[in-house]
């Protein structure tokens, strides 16, 4: 049998078995292991290890894509020194994602431009890296999608999709006042996720001003009652983080 036939068949089998890293690395790694005197078990271990590492990397990539982040940002790139009032240790503790497993919530409060979205994106990325499903949206976009889904009689399916995320990030609550129907739909979604999934909300408004966005004191009170039952508050106050970053880039 030609030496090419086993190689062709092996490539075919590895493709069927969905082992692309095996296919890409087995010859190069075999030569390396031969040089180092590694036995067949060690060779297979290294090959399987590379396949697992690559498979985990692809899974993380798929979760990041499914999350629909507007941009991928990590906490490693966040300049905590620019927002000294932000509790860095609290943020790093949240990055361990144990609060998500406990189905708790996080609310990040602070003026516009102080880095709330960056922190939310960083925590979302950390969750993706730990194997958790994440969804990212703005409050205005979420409400718009729910109203459209309601009009097209697919609201229940959309709500189930939102409820299925281990972590749902709702950015920019408070930037745009919601209609009565929109506020009610948001409340309904928060209620569905209550103690079933973790939710992270960022807002430029303190709690006592949420009525300006939600319209009804009764609805605001009921929503806060659910969202703050098991909650971690991040107070992100200070000068504009975006402005500080812009100045730093120009200075550099």
Language model segments and positions:
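Intrinsically disordered, low-complexity and often Lys/Arg-enriched segments
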Residues: 1-12, 247-252
